[in-house]
């Protein structure tokens, strides 16, 4: 069979299944791929349950995560779907952002209703900025009582509302297992679910449409031309002769103009998200810029020293610390391209954090870092990763 080529014509959306470990996330994921492969055979292939369940290990910021990626298409969109089978894997993925989500399908078994893990996943989705959640009420074939289904649906809506998600989000009754077996009623339920995903999850803003930002990895001088900063464009577009600011690490922000853009030794008029480029900058001495700063569209992001974050601390088996840490812990926080030392304050009532825990923390950095909510960081001790997190709130 000819491999379907990646069509750039359709919007691309990253989604994932979240929810309690026994509520059928992986079965439902397999069912989605099968139902769509049957409905649009020229666009899709199906993935068997065990292909998804035997999730390959991935390293994200030094942390090993078991996670499965499948892709499929509806008429409207191209989807990349992640499924983290284990609870710990899910938490690690959310915090390290091995796979970012533009929206999530919260899977809740109609037989059980929301469980503590369900709540934890929704809370985490809120903290790490998942934009939208809709609900698959799974195993609905096993509940005959309409009142029970309505009760579970109400509970789930309350749970979403409590974390400021859309209380009116679609709640679709499905059976992943029956759909996989080809039962027409439940195949239709999965088709309905995907229609709801198409309709309710908003189109993501493309990286190229966001304001320009490039973390500086290296700085050097080209004799007779000036200073060049290199890095990978994180978002947005940069054109020759545009004004930029260089910010972070140092107390002051510098304004300059990009007079040349180079990629693979060729001169370009434009660099965009994903490109590794060198930017020639006017009137800046080599010693005025350094790795760890960012080049930005003027005024679009600011440097900060104090923030709140959500972090996952590696267990001993994952190569993390062997002992807990306490208030006033002073590791390095690795943002984008550089380490900055910070002092950690734990939440009230938390005496210490054990390896393998996930925790909230307040951090005070010794140098400012250009950041916004959602920015990821690694926690390091002398170059060794001991944790990963993301900024949930900027304080100062």
Swiss-Prot record:
Query: Iron as a keyword?
Result: no
Family matches, as SUPFAM superfamilies: EF-Tu/eEF-1alpha/eIF2-gamma C-terminal domain, P-loop containing nucleoside triphosphate hydrolases, Translation proteins
- The top EC class is hydrolase
Spell out the subcellular localization from the entry: Cytoplasm
Q: Which InterPro entries match?
A: EF-Tu_GTP-bd, EF-Tu_GTPase, EFTu-like_2, EFTU_2, G_TR_CS, P-loop_NTPase, Small_GTP-bd, T_Tr_GTP-bd_dom
Name the domain of life this protein comes from: Bacteria
Q: Where is this region: G3?
A: 83-86
Region G2, residue ranges = 62-66
Question: Which positions in this protein are listed as binding GTP?
Answer: 19-26, 83-87, 138-141
- Quaternary structure and interacting proteins, as annotated: Monomer.
Q: What name does the UniProt record give this protein?
A: Elongation factor Tu
Encoding gene, per UniProt annotation:
tuf
